[in-house]
């Protein structure tokens, strides 16, 4: 089975950046403990627009990690799987 990925978009206002950074650290620790990789990117042209990526070796691992996440995942059923190229 191929790797699976989820993507979540979040908009953060300037006064909330510090709290958001703490939340990201907590999520990073959670997903690492669950056997997943977690990345966050901020849009270059729109400060405060973030994309969060969580990757797992399979859909079941990612679903378990989302189910026990420290914050609710907006659409936990929306998963993307890696496409094997010929």
Model-derived features with residue positions:
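Short S/T/G/P-rich N-terminal loop/turn motif that feeds into the first structured element of a domain
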Residues: 1-86
């Amino acid at each position: 089975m191929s790797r699976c990925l989820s993507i979540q978009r979040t908009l953060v206002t300037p006064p909330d950046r510090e709290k958001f950074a703490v939340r990201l650290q907590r999520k990073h620790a959670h997903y690492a403990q669950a056997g997943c990789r977690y990345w966050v990117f901020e849009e270059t042209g729109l400060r405060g627009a973030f994309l969060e990526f969580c990757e797992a070796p399979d859909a079941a691992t990612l679903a378990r990690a989302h189910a026990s996440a420290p914050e609710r995942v907006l659409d936990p059923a929306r998963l993307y799987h890696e496409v094997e190229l010929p």
